[in-house]
Every structure is written in C-alpha cells, then in structure tokens.
Amino acid sequence: MAIAPNTRVLVAGYGLPAEFCVTTLIGMGVEIDKIAVATHREDNRNCGLHSMLRLRNIQFTTAAANSEEFYEFGANFDPDMIISMHYRSLIPGRFLKLAKKGSVNLHPSLLPAYRGTNSVAWVIINGESETGFSYHRMDENFDTGAILLQERISVEETDTAFSLFHRQIARAMLRLEEVILKLDQGDPGFAQLGEASYYARELPFGGVIDPRWSEVQIDRFIRAMFFPPFPPAVLKIDGKVYYVPSIDIYRSLMRGIPS
C-alpha cells in the first residue's frame, strides 16, 4: 500500500534494518528525493546501507545526533515522519519535533520490559521463554513512547543472541509497512503497560563467566554472549583467558583444568 503523496520520510538508522526500511519506502512509492537518512560512519555492518544510499543518490548525514549539523540536516529536509531503525544514539527532542506526523522506533523487546540496550542478551540470561519487538512512537526518553505495534516471539532453549536477534529482525521487517501506514494515518498508539525494566549499554557481567553460577546459568550466559564477529563469553582461571562459544566447550575446558 502507498502512503500519502509527497510524504517526506527521514530514516535514522544503522545496518540491515535501515537498509530494509529505505527499500520498503521505495516500494511504497516514496520518491527518492523525499527520503533522507541519518546514519553512522561506514563499517562492516553499515556498508550495505552506505552503498545503497550512494547508488540511489539518497541524501544522508553521518553527523552526531547532538550536533548542530545533525539538526540542520533534518530541518532543511523538513520531514513529515521519522523512522528510527537501530539508530545508535538518542535523538534529541527538538529533532523529533521536526516530523509533522511524528516518529517511530523499532525496539527488540516487548516494551516496557527490557528498555535500553543489550535486551536480546538479557532476555536469554534471565531465562525468558518469550520476547518480541515493539514499534513505538518516540519522545525524548529511551523507549517510553506509545506502542504502535508489538509481536511476541518464543525464545528457544538453544537460542543464542545471534539467532534470536536475526529472528526478531526478520519478523519485524515483515510488519514495517503496516507500521509506516499507522504513522502516516495518525494512529496515536497505546500506552506501555506492565512492569518496566532497563538495561544499560555495558556488556553483561563484562562478558566474563562466573564459575560459581549453575550450569544452566552458564549455558544461558554463553548463548547470550554469542554474536559473531564479537568475542564470545570469556572464562578466566589462574590468570589464563579462555574464549567459550558453547556450553560443550565450557565443559571440555573445565574437565581439562586442574581443580
């Protein structure tokens, strides 16, 4: 389905989700000159987006979110809506106010639970049986705006942060067009209900296994830390550092380490 003619959309995003969002907008009939992108510098996870923007001649900026250059980019573009797809900084309130129809963000949890960052890892560490994703309207705080759409996803006993993250992304992308239409049509969403929780950007427990944990806890932690190309969970014993990508390797290491 198409959105209102001449709608101007600013995508604030990073990596594959932002790339998919731009593709979705083009597929919905949004003209190239009515799409702008705020992103981060090109790296291994953001190179696809940068290539697309250059190929399609889509205007973009990599200015820091708290900079005047960032604000001026948005003000000059004059967006009707802002879509945040894994943008890695808090977008200032005055920037959000530029969007006449408002803004929406994709968050990888069932808000208000697991606000903040590393939500996928913490879901596994805490032994949750389900998680999901939330598309929510944006305000000046992290992950507190009204919900436009949520979907639940089961957490499997063998899930790693890597597998769960990609399953969330795949499912969330299937619902993106629906969310864009909600924003375009002025859907106010509904208030976040339930107990809120928040997790900071720091790596859970510094990425280090505590051998005093139960094996169930250790298995969850190892799976939560598995997200290549980043290092897996670490085991430190007698001044030595061991990288532990699976519970089987942990067991093998423990059998070979003198007690």
Curated annotation (Swiss-Prot):
It comes from the Bacteria. It is an enzyme of class 2 (transferase). Its EC number is 2.1.2.14. GO terms for cellular component: cytosol. One of its GO terms (molecular function) is methionyl-tRNA formyltransferase activity. (6S)-5,6,7,8-tetrahydrofolate binds at S89, L90, I91, D139, E140, N141, F142, D143. The keyword Nucleotide-binding does not apply. It catalyses: GDP-alpha-D-perosamine + (6R)-10-formyltetrahydrofolate = GDP-N-formyl-alpha-D-perosamine + (6S)-5,6,7,8-tetrahydrofolate + H(+). InterPro entries: Formyl_transf_N, Formyl_transf_N_sf. Disruption phenotype: Deletion mutant is completely O-antigen-negative. Pfam families: Formyl_trans_N (PF00551). Keywords: Lipopolysaccharide biosynthesis, Transferase. The keyword Transferase applies. Pathway: Bacterial outer membrane biogenesis; lipopolysaccharide biosynthesis. One of its GO terms (biological process) is lipopolysaccharide biosynthetic process. Belongs to the Fmt family. Involved in the lipopolysaccharide (LPS) O-antigen biosynthesis. Catalyzes the transfer of a formyl group to GDP-perosamine, leading to the formation of GDP-N-formylperosamine. In vitro, can also function on GDP-3-deoxyperosamine, thereby providing an enzymatic method for producing a novel trideoxysugar not found in nature. Homodimer. This is GDP-perosamine N-formyltransferase. The lineage of its organism: Bacteria, Pseudomonadati, Pseudomonadota, Alphaproteobacteria, Hyphomicrobiales. The gene is wbkC.
